[in-house]
């Protein structure tokens, strides 16, 4: 029985399908502002490839736009777990903490974004002591 469950979990992963759903979700978000539909597509992207750090990242960005800040943070954290040098994910963690009125945590993530090569952070880092 456990072997069947393991087989299903591995066979249910489909990186190509994940990429298609991710691209669709990003298009719906950026071109049409269809946030609910975009979230559904990005949910499927994550379902089909649990290692697709870009899908978690884009879903995090979408959820910030939807004011689902805690869920966005979880997505950015997952993206960072999968790709520890993901500078844009650190930057967006910082932006999200600003929206949650937590400047100290925001500064931590802005500094990490800078450490991993995110350009144009001077204005953000000036707020940090």
Feature-to-residue mapping (PLM):
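Terminal, low-structured helical/coil segments at or just beyond the last alpha-helical repeat
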Residues: 104-129
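Position-specific recognition of the canonical hydrophobic site in helix A of tetratricopeptide repeat
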Residues: 29-30, 57, 63-64, 98
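Conserved structural position within tetratricopeptide repeats
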Residues: 43-47, 77-81, 112-115
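Canonical tetratricopeptide repeat
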Residues: 58, 92, 124-126
